[in-house]
Amino acid sequence: MSAKDVKFGDSARSKMIAGVNVLADAVKVTLGPKGRNVVIDRSFGAPHITKDGVTVAKEISLKDKFENMGAQLVREVSSKTNDIAGDGTTTATVLAQAILNEGIKSVTAGMNPMDLKRGIDIAVKTVVENIRSIAKPADDFKAIEQVGSISANSDTTVGKLIAQAMEKVGKEGVITVEEGSGFEDALDVVEGMQFDRGYISPYFANKQDTLTAELENPFILLVDKKISNIRELISVLEAVAKTGKPLLIIAEDVEGEALATLVVNNMRGIIKVCAVKAPGFGDRRKAMLQDIAILTGATVISEEVGMSLEQATLQDLGTAHKITVSKENTVIVDGAGDAAAIAERVQQIRAQIEESTSEYDREKLQERVAKLAGGVAVIKIGAATEVEMKEKKDRVDDALHATRAAVEEGVVAGGGVALVRAVNALEGLKGANEDQTAGINILRRAIEAPLRQIVANAGDEPSVVINAVKNGEGNFGYNAATGEYGDMLEMGILDPAKVTRSALEHAASVAGLMLTTECMITDIPEDKPAAPDMGGMGGMGGMM
């Protein structure tokens, strides 16, 4: 076991705060509409330019191990806020730095750190309740557009794209961000249910120009097993052939004699058919087959519930308005399933999302909800260079998360105004003793920090603006982009309540832990002896 370096009291805290300040100073220059860029060197490729606080925070690692501990703790603030709300990482870092720097003055003056932390916690609870009470619902797409624009550093085109995407696929729909191939941003929307499985054989394609199989008003057969024997399918095929409608078969696999017979019948025009592998694996495949069944009004033919393929009838098949199958994807548009059954299935999956502890599982369940409830929208980012593309993608990701948070918990006045207004909720609030009251006052001063930083980044005088905003009422605040005062909601400067709340809660939590730290321990690096010179190889004499 290697030897440890141990620091106590003020010497430990001063090192930790030095690390916090290095990271926070690097992150906070990105805050606000006139936030600056941070250029990050890469060991390979071009440098990365970003205005995203969490990206900057993740890049910072300090040589001094005690300082690095402080930096990593405050980095946790931005990461946690990013995980919960998807945005507000810079605000959280600025708040953590302000609470810590205010708090350390009181600790140095001899106050009890535990009581200070209790006071900070009391104040945070009061401010969070205040934010929740003043939040306005973000129902209309105008509000969504404004939130998206603000979060993307006042880029209105990004806000419009996100609002359009949400309008198309609904607030529950899946919206993904990808790097595009052109200069302009674009929005692609896939309506209906799409899954990443294409036709089993290219001979099923009936549109040779696009190499897709398009089926109008088809029957849909869902089978939870491999099909290799054509005899199992004959009764269903004959029944469908009599109707003259096409047939889509979704099964674990279709192979051998069964596949060959389907291909031949399709090519001869006896029956228009296409076979596709079921999406997912194991239990997830069973669940997704059930989703498709509910969406299309079909019954999954499964031996687990005592159903055999030979006994399947037209009543067991689902239908849809149109199905398009390409080499890699299948899209089912306008399934004929019962609307009430679909809504019930969506509720069921949402309940599973609430219970799930795995981020991956939650993401997959959310995708299933979107496929049942709406569709999938893809925002394709356009840019002139790869560096610009990556920077823009960071901003669009932030904006997308912010709009989701706004839909969830509503919006408050942006630009740090909601926090400054929350000071009024702390008027007359006292703790159980003087030290706790001092903790409440620490937060009272610290929550001005985001507005101060936004103003400083815009090149204006923070104290003048803070006083002007404090003298105003309601949503009155300062628009750093234009240098004007006015109603923040009317000017379209909104922040999601969830982002503001999460930033404050996580900042206060980590800052409180740092204030109550009395000892820090780290490894002493071992001085490894230099490797000895390599001796010459024997037996090599006489070579020219």
From Swiss-Prot:
Key words of the record: ATP-binding, Chaperone, Cytoplasm, Isomerase, Nucleotide-binding, Stress response
Gene Ontology process terms (BP): protein refolding
The enzyme's E.C. designation: 5.6.1.7
Cell compartments where the protein resides: Cytoplasm
Leading EC class: isomerase
Catalytic activity line of the entry: ATP + H2O + a folded polypeptide = ADP + phosphate + an unfolded polypeptide
SUPFAM superfamilies reported for this sequence: GroEL apical domain-like, GroEL equatorial domain-like, GroEL-intermediate domain like
InterPro entries for the chain: Chaperonin_Cpn60_CS, Cpn60/GroEL, Cpn60/GroEL/TCP-1, GroEL-like_apical_dom_sf, GROEL-like_equatorial_sf, TCP-1-like_intermed_sf
Domain of life according to the entry: Bacteria
Function in brief: Together with its co-chaperonin GroES, plays an essential role in assisting protein folding. The GroEL-GroES system forms a nano-cage that allows encapsulation of the non-native substrate proteins and provides a physical environment optimized to promote and accelerate protein folding.
Subunit structure: Forms a cylinder of 14 subunits composed of two heptameric rings stacked back-to-back. Interacts with the co-chaperonin GroES.
Record protein name field: Chaperonin GroEL
Species of origin: Acinetobacter baumannii (strain AYE)
Lineage: Bacteria, Pseudomonadati, Pseudomonadota, Gammaproteobacteria, Moraxellales
